[in-house]
Amino acid sequence: MRRIFVVLPVSTEKWIKETKECVSKVISGATEVHVTNLPGAPTSIETYYDSAKAASLVVDAIVKAEMEGYNAAVIGCFEDPGLHASRELVSMPVLGIGETSIVIASILGKRIAIISTGRNSRAVYERKMIEMGLYRKLAYSCGMELPVL
């Protein structure tokens, strides 16, 4: 049986049930999926500081998950805190929903747009597109002044 570890890099338990329900609709019955939050993390990821604060907790959780026999990990936040550091430390695949979404959108469309919460998110995702070498595909990016919670 395959085992996938999904880490929500926030302290709130608000999205655990919803994430489990979404995953159960698309995952094979032969795959076990464990979804968890991170006590001690920010309640939401809305700033660079929030992301930085959550990153080491994400990395620690993913390293532990690999030791517990998980075959892959998913970081359930578009900001992908701790993604690259996790990949340095484990041998299993680690996906961030932000990076993965951008790659898939870039494959499916000639240009993409990113609309997110938080007035500073435009700069965050433009930087992410530059780092990924996909900035030329970005047609539009904006951050709306909406809190995550």
Regions found by a protein language model. Give the residues of each.
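A short, Lys/Arg-enriched amphipathic alpha-helix followed by its capping loop at the start of a domain
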Residues: 19-31
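N-terminal beta-loop-helix "entrance" segment that forms/cooperates
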Residues: 36-56, 149
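Short, well-structured alpha-helical segments in soluble
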Residues: 52-69
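Hydrophobic structural segments
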Residues: 31, 110-112
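Periplasmic-binding protein-like
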Residues: 6-7, 67-77
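Short beta-strand segments enriched in small/hydrophobic residues
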Residues: 1-16, 112-116, 144
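Short, acidic/small-residue loops that bind anionic groups at enzyme active sites
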Residues: 87-108
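Active-site rim beta-loop-alpha module in soluble metabolic enzymes
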Residues: 126-149
